[in-house]
């Protein structure tokens, strides 16, 4: 039985229940979580969603997520789905769940999708990430959860030149964690923009998909370009080398945000 608190829009729904698949767009501050995926140690985003949706619907719910972000990584537009017989209208799940969620997790929107719609195996057109850097002589405590602090001046023009070599279809094996669980390391990067607003630097990257830690390794490499440790042309050499050890360090998680996942034919 759906346990959603009595509201006017439910008064005339009756008991005609059928299974439906609900898609959620989820935003969160990942600082205090052990990542997306349920694990034995530490509270995760997936765990909170399972708990609160189950409490709302009175069913045992297990969400399926699009991107299993790491501990400390944030999102503005991660995606999850779940199946339910609860009679709450699909578009009202966001409101109902936000009444239950902790302040650092927000359901941006909810909608019904086809019963076989899957957030990972669907037609993903693009994914967009941002990596945020606070570039100043001393840290800003107000930005410590959402930006990576770099005290040495960064040359943005050099970083942009280095980033240009990453645009297009390439084998990004040099830019992924050695634990990447895939044999296909070819991805297409459509665009990389690096913007600076005072002491804030944002690396925004859009592609058809990303390997494990790929964006953070790209950010770590471009930071080395910005500091003058690498020339921009070194990025091309790293790409061609096909060796993880050639690239820069994996940048810390707090600067990374999953901004958006765009799908084709979502409701077909």
What is each residue range found by the language model?
Residues 8-268:
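Structured-RNA-binding interfaces characteristic of tRNA pseudouridine synthases
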């Amino acid at each position: 039985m759906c346990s959603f608190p009595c509201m006017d829009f439910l008064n005339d729904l009756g008991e005609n229940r059928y299974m439906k698949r609900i898609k959620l767009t989820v935003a969160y501050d990942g600082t205090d979580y052990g990542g997306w995926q349920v694990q034995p140690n530490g509270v995760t985003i997936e765990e909170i969603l399972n708990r609160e949706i189950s409490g709302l619907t009175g069913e045992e719910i297990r969400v399926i997520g699009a991107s299993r972000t790491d501990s400390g990584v944030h999102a503005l537009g991660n995606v999850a789905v779940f199946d339910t017989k609860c009679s709450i209208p699909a578009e009202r799940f966001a409101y109902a769940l936000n009444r239950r969620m902790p302040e650092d997790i927000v359901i941006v929107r909810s909608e019904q999708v086809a019963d076989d719609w899957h957030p990972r195996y669907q037609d993903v057109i693009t994914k967009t990430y941002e990596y945020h850097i606070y570039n100043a002589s001393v840290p800003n405590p107000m930005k410590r959860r959402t930006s990576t602090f770099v005290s040495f001046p960064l040359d943005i023009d050099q970083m942009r030149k280095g980033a240009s070599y990453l645009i297009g279809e390439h084998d990004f094996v040099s830019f992924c964690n050695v634990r990447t669980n895939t044999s296909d390391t070819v991805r297409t990067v459509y665009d990389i923009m690096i913007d600076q607003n005072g002491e804030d630097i944002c690396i925004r990257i859009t592609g058809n998909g990303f390997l494990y830690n790929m964006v953070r390794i790209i950010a770590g490499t471009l930071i080395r370009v910005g500091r003058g440790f690498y020339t921009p042309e070194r990025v091309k050499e790293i790409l061609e080398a096909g060796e993880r050890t050639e690239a820069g360090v994996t940048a810390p998680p707090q600067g990374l945000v999953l901004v958006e996942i765009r799908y084709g034919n979502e409701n077909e």
